[in-house]
């Protein structure tokens, strides 16, 4: 047990009291991102080190690892605290998304350390999808680079509103204020093109030396702002899902015996109370909440983010993937949508392709109808393309095999975010964020000849493993 943890437990009056206090602290999920070798892993290591979150055995192991794999000479290589894969240590880079947990007296934190290399942009998008804040590291010697722009855009695309631009390695530019001011101006010029109302803050620091990370730097007296840790402890995170209407995707039908039938899942947004009238989509059947069951017992009310089991007053047909919402809410299922896509596969995404898509607990098939444009990350302009390559970001028009209850991603990431799954390998090949709904709802139905319909029926009957589309079903759906 480290010293600060032992002291905190003693101050709280024992382990049980300390654990209760931890439960009432707010939680901040953030990621570090930026270009290659900007010092992301070193910064996380410095945060853990300076907040005394490293145990004695970890510190001893870090000394040994620094001698074998370190890149800082006689100094501790704090990046090794996070770079856990052997390939990462041998190459001195981050490959996988590494998660670390720590807490201070004011807040709990979950950190996602994401790769800087362009070929691992998909890993970075994975890490950003659950975060509230992004720390964008910039090497003071290099300034704003393409990966800085790419990661900034992906972060905002995935709904992150709080950006902390950490201008690192200030020790290598003699802590000059003019270097900080120039990079700040360059980034603000670029950020004017980013979507949404963003909270952007700038901190000059040295992760290697510890300047302005957890303690104020004596080398940059010209900077009067907060340290990085102070920003993380005090930033006000207003989650949009708390203010959105109630959405409860059913993940599991819980029926341990004949006397109990509940619907388990995580409340995606809003709140739900015992006695509240709810509606089930896609069926539209209504009922009311009889019980809200949790691990700690029954509750009268549950809020967004809580894992609960809902018991209803009526026995109605509900299965995995259905969506529960307030009875007075209207959410029309859609078959067509425009989706912002981050593509993660070697094979490009092209019109005409079909994929399995998973949205909350729902899994269905979708067809790529068109690619409106790909985003040029360097200047955030739109350009016409025939396909979306690996790590490409663009807006895609899709048609689902069945109507889905969807929200716009910026309003509700759970019911507006989806993943693409290759139907042969079952590998996740892309991430999607709903931008527009029913964009092609007024498109006239496609007319198929009798021969085309008969051939389609024959293929579907005798070769079901081909997963051919039901043209007759498409015709009826469009009509």
Swiss-Prot record:
Which PROSITE patterns does its entry note?
Answer: G_TR_1, G_TR_2
Region: G1; residue ranges are 34-41
What enzyme category does the UniProt record give?
A: transferase
* Swiss-Prot/TrEMBL keywords: ATP-binding, GTP-binding, Nucleotide-binding, Nucleotidyltransferase, Transferase
For molecular function, the Gene Ontology terms on record are: ATP binding; GTP binding; GTPase activity; sulfate adenylyltransferase (ATP) activity
UniProt-annotated stretches for the region G5: 206-208
The pathway noted for it is:
Sulfur metabolism; hydrogen sulfide biosynthesis; sulfite from sulfate: step 1/3
**Which biological processes are named by the entry's GO terms?**
hydrogen sulfide biosynthetic process; sulfate assimilation
Is this entry keyworded Magnesium?
no
* Region ranges (G4): 168-171
Q: Where is the tr-type G domain?
A: 25-239
InterPro entries to which the protein is assigned, alphabetical: CysN_GTP-bd, CysN_II, CysN_NoDQ_III, G_TR_CS, GTP-eEF1A_C, P-loop_NTPase, Small_GTP-bd, SO4_adenylTrfase_lsu
Region of interest (G3), residue spans: 113-116
Q: Which residues form a coiled coil?
A: none
Quote the EC number.
2.7.7.4
Reaction equations catalysed: sulfate + ATP + H(+) = adenosine 5'-phosphosulfate + diphosphate
Family according to the record = Belongs to the TRAFAC class translation factor GTPase superfamily. Classic translation factor GTPase family. CysN/NodQ subfamily.
HAMAP family assigned? Sulf_adenylyltr_sub1
Give the protein's recorded name.
Answer: Sulfate adenylyltransferase subunit 1
What organism is recorded for this protein? Salmonella dublin (strain CT_02021853)
Which gene name does the record give? cysN
